[in-house]
Amino acid sequence: MKYIGAHVSAAGGLANAAIRAAEIDATAFALFTKNQRQWRAAPLTTQTIDEFKAACEKYHYTSAQILPHDSYLINLGHPVTEALEKSRDAFIDEMQRCEQLGLSLLNFHPGSHLMQISEEDCLARIAESINIALDKTHGVTAVIENTAGQGSNLGFKFEHLAAIIDGVEDKSRVGVCIDTCHAFAAGYDLRTSAECEKTFADFARIVGFKYLRGMHLNDAKSTFGSRVDRHHSLGEGNIGHDAFRWIMQDDRFDGIPLILETINPDIWAEEIAWLKAQQTEKAVA
């Protein structure tokens, strides 16, 4: 079964994220559990936790259908020790918040070398950061997101993701989230079914589908291989509809959150309905 949704706002309380997801007929959702542009947040209250869990239960969202995202400020591969420790502390806090909320996944951007250390050293720091966080938490899987490769961001090659996973001690609590826009901008073609087959054959060989724990379904304003991260609505960008139809008709993408981060929230309900309809099309065929 496909879990399809969007990254919804948690403004006014975390429980509102589940409510907003239900309003667009989503069967999955993503959210920030705190302000994504601040280092610190007030601890979660018992009331906030209880209300969130109650809303998820009311609208039938399990932890397998929810893909929280961490703060944009965190850089788990930071070359400067003091800044690295700050990021690690913030990441542990994000993991602990998920644990308190009964959430089993935390999606994050791997990190950046800032032109100060090698890619290899940065990837090793990211893996070490994950190990530290996993050691201090329970039941939450660290889900590494591929990047478009802007600036000095790592994670734009499947080999980067594999290298990080290789350095993580508890393989049962690490996974990846593939963002279609990021992959396309990083040079993984998705414009036809044949290109999708090739790209995900590479993914299966280098990383492995057993590590795929979520996806971000975004078309791309950015051009192929541009290393520029610019999302677009489904079918309106340079990827086109075929990739998303292909994903919806492939069983390897079942049972994980498939999350829209497309640019127009007003049409998320339509995009979700369209994605669901592609499954029906397969069943009829």
UniProtKB/Swiss-Prot annotation:
Zn(2+) 3 binds at residues 182, 229, 231. Its EC number is 3.1.21.2. The lineage of its organism: Bacteria, Pseudomonadati, Pseudomonadota, Gammaproteobacteria, Enterobacterales. One of its GO terms (molecular function) is phosphoric diester hydrolase activity. CDD domains: AP2Ec. This is Probable endonuclease 4. Its cofactor is Zn(2+). It holds the Pfam family AP_endonuc_2. PANTHER family: APURINIC-APYRIMIDINIC ENDONUCLEASE (PTHR21445:SF0), ENDONUCLEASE IV ENDODEOXYRIBONUCLEASE IV (PTHR21445). Belongs to the AP endonuclease 2 family. It catalyses: Endonucleolytic cleavage to 5'-phosphooligonucleotide end-products. It comes from Escherichia coli (strain SMS-3-5 / SECEC). Zn(2+) 1 binds at residues 69, 109, 145. Zn(2+) 2 binds at residues 145, 179, 216, 261. Coiled coil: none annotated. Binds 3 Zn(2+) ions. The keyword Manganese does not apply. It comes from the Bacteria. The gene is nfo. InterPro entries: AP_endonuc_2, AP_endonuc_F2_Zn_BS, Xyl_isomerase-like_sf, Xyl_isomerase-like_TIM-brl. Endonuclease IV plays a role in DNA repair. It cleaves phosphodiester bonds at apurinic or apyrimidinic (AP) sites, generating a 3'-hydroxyl group and a 5'-terminal sugar phosphate. One of its GO terms (biological process) is base-excision repair. PROSITE patterns: AP_NUCLEASE_F2_1, AP_NUCLEASE_F2_2, AP_NUCLEASE_F2_3, AP_NUCLEASE_F2_4. Keywords: DNA damage, DNA repair, Endonuclease, Hydrolase, Metal-binding, Nuclease, Zinc.
